[in-house]
UniProtKB/Swiss-Prot annotation:
InterPro entries, alphabetized: Poxvirus_G7
Subcellular location: Host cytoplasm; Virion
Name of a matching Pfam family: Pox_G7
Site (Cleavage): G187, F188, G238, L239
Modified how: Phosphorylated on serines by F10 kinase, phosphorylation state is regulated by H1 phosphatase.
Induction remark: Expressed in the late phase of the viral replicative cycle.
This protein's GO CC annotations: host cell cytoplasm; virion component
Function of the molecule: Late protein which is a part of a large complex required for early virion morphogenesis. This complex participates in the formation of virosomes and the incorporation of virosomal contents into nascent immature virions.
Native organism taxonomy: Viruses, Varidnaviria, Bamfordvirae, Nucleocytoviricota, Pokkesviricetes
Protein name listed in UniProt: Assembly protein G7
Quaternary structure, from the entry: Part of a complex composed of A30, G7, F10 kinase, A15, D2, D3, and J1.
Organism: Vaccinia virus (strain Western Reserve)
Keyword terms of this UniProt record: Host cytoplasm, Phosphoprotein, Virion
Amino acid sequence: MAAEQRRSTIFDIVSKCIVQSVLRDISINSEYIESKAKQLCYCPASKKESVINGIYNCCESNIEIMDKEQLLKILDNLRCHSAHVCNATDFWRLYNSLKRFTHTTAFFNTCKPTILATLNTLITLILSNKLLYAAEMVEYLENQLDSSNKSMSQELAELLEMKYALINLVQYRILPMIIGEPIIVAGFSGKEPISDYSAEVERLMELPVKTDIVNTTYDFLARKGIDTSNNIAEYIAGLKIEEIEKVEKYLPEVISTIANSNIIKNKKSIFPANINDKQIMECSRMLDTSEKYSKGYKTDGAVTSPLTGNNTITTFIPISASDMQKFTILEYLYIMRVMANNVKKKNEGKNNGGVVMHINSPFKVINLPKC
């Protein structure tokens, strides 16, 4: 019986985002392609060709182009993906050929079979390149973090280093991009421009963890009309670096925010008139859950978005033309890979010629000098 292929939750999310961004302007049910894409992580070399051919066959069977205007719209979306194709010559040959077919309507209609074959090949080229790049980076990240050949102290240090490195990535790179603010440079004042990408990432990791960017982002989202009252995810993820106060202190305020109503100012009731018992219990449950996470009673690591349903990739923060949905996800995966490599180098044990001593601690061993 063949061994079951390892799956990656991270890659399942990333691959779906990649597929939907590439097929954004194409009328096709992408579920089959998404299921095929997920197979490319931890995929043996002998199986990759079959998976990629399955993606092409699905495109060939389902993609239809009605007119040259539709083709031009599709090409406008595909152009930005050229940066993630290993052989740019292949990309531009296919892309420019498709552009030529839009010269006249008669030429377009006559050559439609050739156009479809060319477009299907271009889409498969982009998808397979981006998915394989993403799979390689996700595999590196997961293997680095899940490696069993580490002492407990090294594993703890690396997990914490990576956690706060990712928090800084969100605070200094992703959130400023979403709200349209200038991205803060990770280097220190007076330094020469950084030529080493690893050094740039290292400085990003050294920037202060506590910033105002989360509150600034909430203000931005509130101006866009998005409900920002439920911020449990920020506490769990470590983005909102604040102590959670007692439930009783903030329950009326939270309920008032959700209801968008003034609190009745009398001694008999501290709740808005249009809040029922069910809503009060829901708010209480949410805050109780936050408190449990903050005290470590719940350690499942689950994080859900406070802004959307978070059921599918399409329920991300609903900002139109978001770069994250278009093509930059691979750049951020690469930054995460460099971060993981930097964390590994920082915490790798060096042979100091000492003696390993076993102790009755969860960390099990310490190194002592030879005496």
